Amino acid sequence: MLITPNTTHEPRTPAIAEAIEEALEQRMLLTHPFYRRWEAGELQLGELDSYARNYRSFEAALPVVLSAVVQRLNTDGSAEVANRVQRNLDDELGRPESHLALFDRFAAAVSPPGSATEAAEAGPAADALVATYTDLVEEGPVAALSALAAYETQASAIAASKAEGLRRWYGIDGAGAAFWDVHAAMDADHGDWAIDALASLDADPAVVRVAAKRAADAWWTFLDECEAAAPVGASCAG
């Protein structure tokens, strides 16, 4: 994937984008066997249900991550960048409504009637994914924003692919696909915000690369766990 950054504001943006791209080598999520099977309609509903139960833990943690980054940036005197992150937090909490609420409708669409996705216990890789982001937040805004950029730069394409797969293969539309529709449109509009924020902080591309790689590896391991639970004979080879 070639990340084409917005270069109108910060001269360091291309170097940051290149660092993110290098971190994502062999870790572009749409190439993972689990997402390839989603695109091809080869996932069973039970796999989508399990995925939703695990992914929810990250979606629930994301506002906490963003809030912590905003607080740290304000403490460090980086109010302009803090405002940029705050806008994304505001989107997460209420544009067009809480994204967690939108996600729960997706989860309900792929889960057995009467199941409570929000009460489900996440698996080890999902817990590790959240822990990775939490650890990077504690390291500081550059590390946290690098982790966010590792996902945000590919989020629009991932969301669009998921929404298309849900409609085409599983007959899930409307409320069931809205979470992915919102992210496909919203992230296409400003998916490079984290790269711009890193450039505004004059982040060291080497530091960005290391933190983004940690996040990318955690996402890949999460999908490995999803794929490992596939029924015998269902997993994608290669």
Predicted regions and their residues:
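Non-heme di-metal
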Residues: 2-238
